[in-house]
């Protein structure tokens, strides 16, 4: 990879925002992948550490070459990580949103990410005890801690990660939902949900049934 910050000084803020969120999604999915290894996890966690420090700096100032160089490194590390560990549900869904509605790939990933974290960790099932939550909770909690987030238990720490992602999207003017984009009608979107879910499930990286896929896209 050619990691030269001077080549991306003129990249507009909106494209920077989409790109850095794609980097973060790459690293996060590699971290929680069931195919992860010690080596891929080390690369992904370092990428997340760099993103946490330099994401907003790179977005706010294209001339901050140090921040852009660090985000280049984060991108490369995340790429090496997911090349080994693979990606997951977030990318499977984002590919379909991009193909159907021409949403930039990083932006589609960013809008989906809070919902995918909640789905993978199952933290919205209030009736469960701490021990019954999915193994992804521990991995997401680790990611949150790398970003400097913490709470009194792992479940609340994962919630802090969801809040962090949503905060970053707001700071970078990325819509939190399809409806906030204002370019896709509600009817058009809901008519496409079934076909997008079916297409996402055809990807080998998806381990979710059709009903769950439709629920997430709703």
Task: Go through each PLM region and give its residues.
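A glycine/threonine-rich phosphate-anchoring loop and its flanking beta-alpha core
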Residues: 1-36, 135-142
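Residues on a specific face of well-ordered alpha-helices
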Residues: 18, 22, 26, 45-49, ...
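Glycine-rich phosphate/diphosphate-binding loops and the adjacent beta-loop-alpha structural elements
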Residues: 30-84, 95-98
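Short coil/turn segments at secondary-structure boundaries
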Residues: 66, 156, 179-182, 208-213
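Glycine-rich phosphate/pyrophosphate-binding beta-alpha loops
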Residues: 76-109, 202-205
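Gly/Pro-rich interdomain helix-loop hinge
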Residues: 103, 107-188
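Short, amphipathic C-terminal "tail helix"
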Residues: 187-218
């Amino acid at each position: 990879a050619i990691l030269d910050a001077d080549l991306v000084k003129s990249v507009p803020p909106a494209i920077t925002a989409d790109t850095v969120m794609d980097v973060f999604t790459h690293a996060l999915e590699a971290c929680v992948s069931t195919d992860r290894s010690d080596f891929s996890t080390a690369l992904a966690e370092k990428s997340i550490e760099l993103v946490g420090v330099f994401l907003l700096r790179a977005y706010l100032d294209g001339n901050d070459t140090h921040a852009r160089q660090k985000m280049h490194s984060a991108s490369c590390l995340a790429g090496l990580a997911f090349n080994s560990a693979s990606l997951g549900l977030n990318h499977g869904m984002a590919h379909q949103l991009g193909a159907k509605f021409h949403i930039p790939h990083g932006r589609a990933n960013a809008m989906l990410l809070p919902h995918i974290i909640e789905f993978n960790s199952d933290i919205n099932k209030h009736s469960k005890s701490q021990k019954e939550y999915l193994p992804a909770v521990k991995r997401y909690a680790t990611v949150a801690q790398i970003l400097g987030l913490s709470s009194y238990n792992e479940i609340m720490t994962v919630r802090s990660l969801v809040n962090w992602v949503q905060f970053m999207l707001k700071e970078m003017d990325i819509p939190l939902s399809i409806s906030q984009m204002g370019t896709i009608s509600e009817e058009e979107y809901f008519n496409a949900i079934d076909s997008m879910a079916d297409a996402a499930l055809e990807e080998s990286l998806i381990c979710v049934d059709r009903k769950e896929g439709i629920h997430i896209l709703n």
